[in-house]
């Protein structure tokens, strides 16, 4: 059956080159490193491996095409942070190591831009930062506490993260009900599909092999079983993110959650003069049910949000990506935020699956004794962290000393998710509670105790 890959996102539809799949695996083979997953994590790992040791035989195994998953569908936020936040790293290691991880994440945003330039990847990279609005009193208080805490505990300055008053925030994004906001400098907007497709081409040029249309069935020490043959490898890298649950024995490793997006038609200069985002800042507000957007290189708004239900037993179902009522709700949120967009044409509606570990803490690891390596669990914030993860994995695998190989997420192993039906009840219950918390905060102006309690339970 022919798959219409361009229908999977604005970014894939707009990709200027062909999306024809590379050849699948042609039978049993033997390599030095087998990387399972042709998204950011897998390709960054392969890219850095081949730069560190060009003699390595590196094989990337991808079920569909490079960028089919979240790497070709996300919001294009290359942001220097983890979903878990630095407090988690501070608790589990030390303040000093948490600061080092933050610094490495900030640098990874610039590293993505450097590699895009070096490899001539035209992905519309624009480091304009993030504007996160406060649109009720609870959001404003939460932001004020966050900025003060991060500057005090982790040494951030106004050059990294700063509060904006209402006028300053509206000058960046002319939204409704703005009380203030936070500006975070370490973010770039980009076209995610052009980045991941360009990475695939870079891996090809470096001598790596990418086998597409090849489904990995199981992974174990020294071996990957696929539907096109068995791969023997000294090192096996799991880089499957939201699709990890499809591997034998990994149904409870990461839970796949959906995020859905829409894109407007290209907007005229008069509309942009009213909206703002002059530096292509990415944007959001501080609600618990996350929204996120960017001004694309061709003048659209690409805008998304959470809220799609979790499928029982980690079910991945393409029909969830086209739930029209969820897309309609996302459009309502966009117009409520920016009323001047009422009536603009929506040209694309899509969605994708992201990977969530039980403790919301991404990890990178390599067991030299077994040759098993892994990275992921970014909870939807993987564009920049995947670069750091792939770079770190390559250094661990090749035995290269660097300041990255002992960062606090290296070697972390999240506990397994609960079995069904507990998992289904807990995740979908949490989604409902967070939506309720947002409504309560909007009405009362006070931070929701429901949300505070739920965050503690989830993490």
Q: Which stretches of residues belong to each language-model region?
A:
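Active-site-proximal substrate-binding core of FAD-dependent oxidoreductases
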Residues: 356, 368, 396-431
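Dinucleotide-binding Rossmann-like beta1-alpha1 core, especially the glycine-rich loop
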Residues: 81-166
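Extreme N-terminal leader/targeting segments of oxidoreductases
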Residues: 1-33, 51-57, 456
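Glycine-rich FAD pyrophosphate-binding loop
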Residues: 50-73
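Helical element adjacent to the flavin cofactor pocket in flavoenzyme catalytic cores
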Residues: 148-153, 176-234
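Glycine-rich Rossmann-fold phosphate-binding loop(s) that bind the pyrophosphate
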Residues: 37-43, 63
């Amino acid at each position: 059956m022919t798959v219409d890959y361009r229908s999977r996102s604005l970014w894939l539809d707009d990709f200027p080159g062909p999306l024809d799949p590379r050849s699948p695996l042609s039978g049993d083979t033997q390599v030095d490193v087998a990387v399972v997953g042709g998204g950011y994590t897998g390709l960054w790992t392969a890219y850095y491996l081949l730069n560190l040791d060009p003699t390595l035989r590196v094989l990337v195994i991808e079920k569909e095409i490079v960028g089919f998953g979240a790497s070709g569908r996300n919001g294009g936020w290359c942001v220097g942070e983890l979903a878990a936040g630095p407090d988690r790293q501070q608790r589990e290691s030390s303040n000093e190591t948490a600061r080092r991880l933050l610094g490495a994440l900030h640098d990874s945003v610039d590293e993505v831009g450097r590699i895009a330039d070096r490899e001539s990847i035209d992905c519309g990279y624009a480091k304009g930062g993030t504007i996160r609005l406060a649109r009720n009193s609870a959001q404003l208080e939460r932001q004020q506490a966050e900025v003060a805490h991060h500057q005090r505990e982790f040494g951030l300055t106004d050059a990294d993260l700063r509060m904006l008053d209402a006028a300053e925030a509206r000058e960046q994004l002319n939204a409704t009900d703005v009380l203030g906001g936070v500006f975070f400098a370490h973010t770039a907007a980009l076209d995610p599909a052009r980045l991941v497709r360009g990475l695939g081409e870079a891996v090809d040029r470096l001598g790596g092999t990418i086998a597409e249309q090849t489904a990995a069935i199981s992974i174990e020490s020294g071996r990957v079983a696929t539907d096109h043959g068995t791969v023997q490898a000294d090192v096996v890298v799991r880089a499957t993110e939201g699709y990890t649950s499809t591997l034998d024995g990994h149904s409870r490793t990461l839970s796949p959650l959906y995020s859905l997006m829409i894109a407007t038609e290209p907007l005229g200069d008069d509309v942009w003069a009213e909206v703002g985002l002059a530096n292509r800042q990415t944007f959001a507000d501080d609600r618990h049910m996350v929204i996120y957007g960017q001004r694309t290189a061709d003048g659209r708004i690409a805008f998304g949000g959470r809220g799609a239900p979790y499928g029982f037993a980690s079910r991945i179902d393409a029909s969830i990506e086209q739930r029209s009522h969820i897309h309609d709700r996302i459009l309502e949120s966009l117009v409520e935020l920016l009323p001047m967009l009422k009536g603009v044409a929506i040209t694309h509606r899509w969605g994708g699956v992201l990977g969530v570990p039980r403790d919301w803490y991404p990890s990178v690891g390599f067991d030299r004794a077994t040759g098993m390596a892994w990275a992921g669990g970014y909870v939807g914030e993987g564009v920049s962290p995947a670069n750091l993860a792939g770079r770190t994995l390559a250094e661990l695998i090749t035995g290269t000393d660097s300041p990255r190989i002992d960062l606090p997420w290296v070697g972390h192993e999240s506990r397994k998710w609960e079995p069904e039906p507990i998992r289904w009840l807990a995740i979908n219950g949490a989604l409902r509670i967070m939506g309720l918390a947002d409504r309560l905060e909007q009405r009362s102006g006070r931070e929701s105790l429901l949300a505070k309690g739920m965050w503690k339970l989830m993490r």
